[in-house]
């Protein structure tokens, strides 16, 4: 059965009861030339643990874009980072709608079978998964709808295609159901204004471009305006899906777990252990571990009255009392577990460049959350190559943020493994926040690594703060400092409280995790996950403005720390950027790359070439090596009279290894001297072989040929 729905600028075609009929729910969705299959499957037996056993997989098939997977294994293997991040978006959007007490292991799989470069696969995949879930026998009140908002020439655009998104200064992804928002991801997109200028250079006149960059932060009011547009579109989409598919939804006969109450245990604990629990809460405010509650549970279990009580029932009841005390204290007294007011940021300490041999480093500590963020600068060859499904060629990622969360950061003895979804998600959020502050024309590739050394909430935002200062510490001319803060929400009995800089305890027992990052001029990135089943605009507005207050407080502290930064110039890589005649690039490369390999090996540098612009970028650890390599390249490409392009332009057929000549020094360069042998043919006497001599032009030297390679002659001094 096929349904065609015109909604939010898109024509979406759904086929139900056509494929994957053994699944609990399945749809084959088409939009443009993109086709995705979304399926939902669940087990019949509930898990005993008190959590939602939901897994989401998003898989891009290479054949969807007419490709064969690269590498030795010609099939899809582990998911790429992009696939993992899309799976997280789908998971975070759908998870809040599962009913309380649902405990069946459930898997949602979205497979991209055909990929149209013009279609937004993230939005399409979420909507397909939402409809498949709604069609299943899992009780859902309404279908979720996802939309993307862009901004071009100051105007907000609903569901921009990929081409429009390239020209957008905003990427806002929102998911919700009816008039409630469930998940938000936003990033500001910097734009470049290009100006062509003509430069008269010593070796080649070139037409080059200069650019100026705008970070394009959004104000809180602009974000709310964009969210209002998204909310209306979500309502339209959610209603359209419900109208089309409600009659096809399977009847739900799923049994939900009833929350087990232990009134006797609850009364006993509230009457006898309130003081100990409050003390435990104070301790837990300093750590993400629950060991304090376990101690109380053990103490209760040893009592005579508790002989008939299971350890699980005692622990569950303790957790409920703890949650009730924490939330009640916040809502009724405006006081938090660690004694802070609702809008108070934890104490901050900052140290920079504490690692003497790293390019830039920052130890950022906020309360009991600590991030060591390290910046490393590299050449173009250090960029991360990413193979995207809808791109013909791999793209180069020149700004990377890696986030690591070892077990010891929360006092756990767990093995350090490859990064999981959480690490990838937190690193991606920090990258989105910091990216607009880095000039896209900065010549170095940048890698930031965040090592979380201690965690009690908001470690991703500590990564943003530490990362911004680590860039400064590495001498990166970032446009503005960027800070981040995590906001929380407690909502109960029509009362709510917004919390600034939440700790782990408040994240666990709260109703929202809302991370906001930006400069003093606006927001560069935000991410919201809600546990309530939706949030209204008024609450969101308060959270945004309270986050601004906290962000500016943090930025003031960071600005003072930035003034004290001493850049360690000695360890920073050196770089020389210059232009040559683009037609001469082939001379620098040489036959099969022999010449450029020779230069790299001889001078210990890395070289990047732009064939179209004639730009040459040389990077290395020593200025002398870079200058010598530059002079060597200029000598190769120079067309001025009196300067030899190299012995390959002369007939060297009569020269042999070991031949001796009384030569004349014709030119001295930092890397050596060019000695004329005979018939205008030069040999290079490398500087390493003539350091003890004070050579001058026209000086007579006795030399012998030590190497003939690629039409060039190298010589040594005769003994």
Swiss-Prot record:
Residues 573-633 form the KH domain. Gene3D superfamilies: GHMP Kinase, N-terminal domain, K Homology domain, type 1, Nucleic acid-binding proteins. Mg(2+) binds at residues 507, 513. It is found in: Cytoplasm. Its cofactor is Mg(2+). It catalyses: RNA(n+1) + phosphate = RNA(n) + a ribonucleoside 5'-diphosphate. GO terms for cellular component: cytosol. GO terms for biological process: mRNA catabolic process; RNA processing. Signal peptide: none annotated. Its EC number is 2.7.7.8. One of its GO terms (molecular function) is RNA binding. It comes from the Bacteria. Residues 658-719 form the S1 motif domain. CDD domains: KH-I_PNPase (cd02393), RNase_PH_PNPase_2 (cd11364). Belongs to the polyribonucleotide nucleotidyltransferase family. This is Polyribonucleotide nucleotidyltransferase.
């Amino acid at each position: 059965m096929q349904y065609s729905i015109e909604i939010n600028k898109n024509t979406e075609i759904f086929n139900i009861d056509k494929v994957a009929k053994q699944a609990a729910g399945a749809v084959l969705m088409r939009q443009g030339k993109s086709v995705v299959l979304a399926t939902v499957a669940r087990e019949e037996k509930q898990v005993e643990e008190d959590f939602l056993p939901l897994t989401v997989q998003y898989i891009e098939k290479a054949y969807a874009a007419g490709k064969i997977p690269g590498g030795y294994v010609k099939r899809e293997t582990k998911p790429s980072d992009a696939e993992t991040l899309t799976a997280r978006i789908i998971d975070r959007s759908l998870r809040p709608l599962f009913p309380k007490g649902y405990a069946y292991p459930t898997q949602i799989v979205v497979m991209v079978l055909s990929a149209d470069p013009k279609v937004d696969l993230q939005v399409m995949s979420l909507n397909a998964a939402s409809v498949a879930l709604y069609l299943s026998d899992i009780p859902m009140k309404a279908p979720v709808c996802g939309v993307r908002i862009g901004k071009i020439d100051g105007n907000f655009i609903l569901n921009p295609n990929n081409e429009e998104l390239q020209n957008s200064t905003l990427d806002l992804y929102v998911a919700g159901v009816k008039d409630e928002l469930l998940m938000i991801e936003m990033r500001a997109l910097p734009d470049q204004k290009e100006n062509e200028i003509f430069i008269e250079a010593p070796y080649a006149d070139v037409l080059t471009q200069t650019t100026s960059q705008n970070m394009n932060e959004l104000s809180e009011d602009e974000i709310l305006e964009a969210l209002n547009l998204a909310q209306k579109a979500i309502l339209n989409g959610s209603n359209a899906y419900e109208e089309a598919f409600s009659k096809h939804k399977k009847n739900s006969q799923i049994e939900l777990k009833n929350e087990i109450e232990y009134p006797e245990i609850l009364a006993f604990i509230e009457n006898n252990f309130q003081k100990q629990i409050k003390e435990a809460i104070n301790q837990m405010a300093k750590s993400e571990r629950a060991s304090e509650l376990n101690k109380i549970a053990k103490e209760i279990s040893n009592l005579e009255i508790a002989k008939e009580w299971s350890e699980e029932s005692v622990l569950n009841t303790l957790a409920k009392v703890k949650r009730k005390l924490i939330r009640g204290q916040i809502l009724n007294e405006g006081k938090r577990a660690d004694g802070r007011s609702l809008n108070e940021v934890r104490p901050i300490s900052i140290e920079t460049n504490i690692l003497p041999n790293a390019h830039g480093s920052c130890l950022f500590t906020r309360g009991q959350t600590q991030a060591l963020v390290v910046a490393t600068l590299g050449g173009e060859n250090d960029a991360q190559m990413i193979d995207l499904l809808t791109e013909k060629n791999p793209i180069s990622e020149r700004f990377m943020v890696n986030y690591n969360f070892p077990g010891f950061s929360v006092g756990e003895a767990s093995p350090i493994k490859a990064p999981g979804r959480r690490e990838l998600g937190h690193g991606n959020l920090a990258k989105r926040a910091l990216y607009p502050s880095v000039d896209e024309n900065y010549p170095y590739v940048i890698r930031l690594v965040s090592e979380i050394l201690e965690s009690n909430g908001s470690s991703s935002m500590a990564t943003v703060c530490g990362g911004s200062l680590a860039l400064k510490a590495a001498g990166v001319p970032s446009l503005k400092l960027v800070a981040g803060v995590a906001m929380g929400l407690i909502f109960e009995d029509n009362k709510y409280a917004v919390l600034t800089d939440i700790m782990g305890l408040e994240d666990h027992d709260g109703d929202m995790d809302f991370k906001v990052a930006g400069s003093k001029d606006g927001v560069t990135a935000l991410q919201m996950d809600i546990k309530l089943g939706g949030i209204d605009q008024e609450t969101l507005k308060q959270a945004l403005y309270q986050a601004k207050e906290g962000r500016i407080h943090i930025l003031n502290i960071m600005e003072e720390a930035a003034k004290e930064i001493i850049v360690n110039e000695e360890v920073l890589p050196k770089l020389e950027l210059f232009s040559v005649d683009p037609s001469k690039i082939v001379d620098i490369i040489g036959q099969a790359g022999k010449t450029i390999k020779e230069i790299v090996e001889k001078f210990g540098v890395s070289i990047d070439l732009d064939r179209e612009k004639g730009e040459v970028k040389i990077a290395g650890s020593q200025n002398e090596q870079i200058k010598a390599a530059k002079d060597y390249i200029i000598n190769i490409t120079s067309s001025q009279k009196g300067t030899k392009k190299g012995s390959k332009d002369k007939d060297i057929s009569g020269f042999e290894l070991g031949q001796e000549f009384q030569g004349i020094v014709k030119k001295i360069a930092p890397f050596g001297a060019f000695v004329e042998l005979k018939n205008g043919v030069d040999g290079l006497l490398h500087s390493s072989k003539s350091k003890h001599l004070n050579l001058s032009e026209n000086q007579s030297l006795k030399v012998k040929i030590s190497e003939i390679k690629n039409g060039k002659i190298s010589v040594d001094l005769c003994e």
